[in-house]
């Protein structure tokens, strides 16, 4: 069992706002491609503090939307503590390893990325 048994509560609501504006933009971009698939948002991974921003169960594709705090220390997001930033980097690495181990393609989208089909094809992911 990879995900919590109550995974249904994480089923995506395509119209509901997301944690961030960019995450909502990604959701709206993938909707025409994934609208008929089984898709979850903020899906928790069993036995960890990890969650996946989006997970398509039909295609075994996860999407992580990475804000600037995933690329550099940010006093606000990391509570003015560099150890918190290092912990975040470790969690990001754990997500990558989790996905690799379980045959899940992971697409990481950063704030500055142009959300497009070309972006997904760089990860060899075809929507």
Walk through the language-model features, giving the residues of each.
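Nucleic-acid endo/exonuclease domains
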Residues: 1-127
């Amino acid at each position: 069992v990879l995900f919590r048994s109550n995974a249904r509560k994480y089923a995506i609501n395509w119209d509901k706002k997301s944690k961030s504006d960019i995450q909502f933009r990604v959701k709206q971009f993938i909707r025409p491609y994934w609208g008929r698939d089984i898709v979850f948002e903020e899906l928790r991974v069993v036995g960890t503090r990890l969650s996946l921003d989006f997970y398509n169960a039909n295609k075994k594709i996860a999407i992580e939307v990475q804000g600037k705090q995933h690329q550099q220390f940010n006093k606000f997001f990391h509570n003015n503590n560099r150890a918190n930033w290092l912990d975040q980097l470790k969690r990001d690495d754990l997500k990558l390893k989790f996905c690799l181990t379980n045959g899940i393609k992971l697409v990481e989208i950063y704030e500055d990325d142009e959300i497009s089909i070309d972006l997904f094809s760089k990860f060899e992911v075809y929507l």
